[in-house]
């Protein structure tokens, strides 16, 4: 697996095996 870079307010989709297994929008980054 490769890390997914995300920014606040960025919509993202987590794909695995060509299918979307997770999707959403980053509301707050907890560092």
UniProtKB/Swiss-Prot annotation:
Kindly report the protein's main subcellular placement as a broad class.
cytoplasm
Q: Which terms are listed as keywords in the entry?
A: Cytoplasm, Elongation factor, GTP-binding, Nucleotide-binding, Protein biosynthesis
What are this entry's molecular-function GO terms? GTP binding; translation elongation factor activity
Q: Which Pfam families match?
A: GTP_EFTU_D3 (PF03143)
Indicate whether Membrane appears among the record's keywords.
Answer: no
Q: Which InterPro entries match?
A: Transl_elong_EF1A/Init_IF2_C, Transl_elong_EFTu/EF1A_C
Q: Which organism is it from?
A: Streptomyces laurentii
Task: Name a single GO cellular component.
Answer: cytoplasm
User: What is the protein name stated in its UniProt record?
Assistant: Elongation factor Tu
Q: Which domain of life is it from?
A: Bacteria
């Amino acid at each position: 697996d490769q890390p997914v870079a995300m920014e606040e307010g960025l919509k993202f989709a987590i794909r695995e095996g060509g299918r979307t297994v997770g999707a959403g929008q980053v509301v707050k980054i907890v560092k």
